[in-house]
Amino acid sequence: MSHPFDLTGRTILVTGATSGLGRQTAISVSEMGAQVVINGRNEERLADTFSKLEGEGHLAVSADLAVGETRSAFVNKLPPLDGIAHCAGVTLLHPFKFNDERQFREVYAANVEAPFFVTQGVFKSKRLKPGASIVFVSSISPHAGLKGHAIYAGSKAALHGISRVLAHELAGSKIRSNCVSPGMVRTEVVAGFAHQVSPELVAIDEARYPLGYGTPDDVANAIIFFLAPASKWITGVDLTMDGGRT
């Protein structure tokens, strides 16, 4: 009997694999036996992630998925998939009264349009196998109402709705769709946040997390759960991961 978290023989697409959660997810998924297709915009960092993958048969495809024409070409390069981990995305910390249309379009193109139309393209081209699993990486921002996150939180809330609908529309093909919604995780983004504000403010924010900030491993392990047979009876779920913050 195979282990319920074993991904051997499965092919998983991981977007945003050049850094942070996407990078760790790609590495962790390969450690569980999967063949991984990794995507990111920076070819050098993508190659570095590729060098860290365990096993053989992996594929790296550099592309900016926020651009429609690029998405179509990207989908055409993909093999049949057993799962997708949508880890790519951008953040924006900016007061509501100063938000503009350019910011809105850029954030929604990366955080909503890219995962939506990549998933649609993969499904319509029959590259998403029956029984596959889709995982969207959202955020606690829609739940927490964090100041300065109006555009970002809206984009991540959209993923909740999309995932929930896909859970019903794709159930006939036994394709599952779920979200993971992390709080602050110790990635390059958090390090940049500390420089943007101050280490003292970061410490104050972390104190709001009963279990402290998370690590990329924490989120990657949850994504593996949703990609693996262990969660075969779970779909349409949004898993909040924030160490008790909300």
Tell me what each language-model feature is.
Residues 208-219:
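A conserved structural motif in NAD(P)-dependent oxidoreductases
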Residues 2-3, 144, 224, 235-246:
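Short C-terminal tail/terminal secondary-structure segment
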Residues 95-96, 100-108, 201, 205:
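Substrate-binding pocket helix/loop in short-chain dehydrogenase/reductase
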Residues 18-19:
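Conserved glycine-rich cofactor-binding loop
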Residues 124, 168-172, 232:
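Alpha-helical segment proximal to the catalytic Tyr-Lys
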Residues 119, 155, 163:
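Active-site helix of classical SDR
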Residues 139:
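Residue(s) in the substrate-gating loop at a strand-loop-helix junction
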